[in-house]
Curated annotation (Swiss-Prot):
GO terms for molecular function: ATP binding; creatine kinase activity; protein kinase activity. NCBIfam families: PRK01059.1-4, PRK01059.1-5. This is Protein-arginine kinase. It catalyses: L-arginyl-[protein] + ATP = N(omega)-phospho-L-arginyl-[protein] + ADP + H(+). It comes from Bacillus cereus (strain AH187). Residues 24-254 form the Phosphagen kinase C-terminal domain. It is an enzyme of class 2 (transferase). GO terms for biological process: phosphocreatine biosynthetic process. Appears to be allosterically activated by the binding of pArg-containing polypeptides to the pArg-binding pocket localized in the C-terminal domain of McsB. It comes from the Bacteria.
Amino acid sequence: MSLDKIMNEAISPWMKGDGPDSDIVLSSRIRLARNFKKYQFSTMQNEEEAKQIQELFKKEFINKTVEPFGEFELLKMNELTPLQRRVLVEKHLISPNLAGTEYGACLLSENEHISVMLNEEDHIRIQCLFSGLQLSEALQSANQIDNWIEKEVEYAFDESLGYITSCPTNVGTGLRASVMIHLPGLVLTKRISRIIQVIQKLGLVVRGIYGEGSEALGNIFQVSNQMTLGKSEEDIIADLKSVIQQIIQQEKMARELIVQNSSIELEDKVYRSYGILANSRLIQSAEAANCLSDLRLGIDLGYIKGISRNILTELMVLTQPGILQQYAGGPLGPEERDYRRATLIRERLRIEKN
């Protein structure tokens, strides 16, 4: 695996999967926060300690193979251009926080299912991504990597509290489980606000597709647990999965209601968005996201034939500003990005239809 390959292949293997409930659930993510006993927290550490953690991973873990994830490569943030960092964020391989650090790094698996972020808010954050609703499978893979790393380092762990983390909400298991979910039916029926309120009362968090502070573009929401102390990993996963399954049922009911009461209006909305995507010469990010959401809904409901439902996930990533500029070989102005975005979408749809 090379940096060029990571940068030039915008679609990660997990995006091409077709996991359970993938008509509504786009992806499942597990993140484990861990700190090393011998070092201060990342928020307090000095440059020397941050470099020592990088060197430890360079020595012990790069070019090592762990099945089924392949080899691992270490990407240091201060050796990447701002554009390369942005691409990694847009591919969901690193967090925006890590991209902004000077001594952060990412240990990335060949198949891009696993990303271990170094020197972010915690010493390491192990991330595992799967398509569809596969929280248990993602947790199993994350634990496999956790055990692999723990053979070489001693974690900060307290018998009564669990794993010690820089943020109190992560103390305990250090587990953050999240699901990316497409909810156009609940948005169109204006039920989404009530659903979000219920989710939050259950102790869960609802965010946009790039986490804290990001927008829910294209009717895509990220739902995750908040507290980890006093709960087992299995309980956290079971609680989140139960809520997600209820949201899935609510979304299906909302879609059925729209089809029953406003079928021709919905079909018109889908085909108008399809027409914009198939013919536009300039299109901005927000409009593209909304039209792609309509197209995906049309595919799921059977209005649109011959186009893969994965097109929403793929094009939501492919048309992000960083990836567009990476493909262009350098910086682009807003209008140039809008032109390239429209061109890429038209070509992708043409390939699908052929």
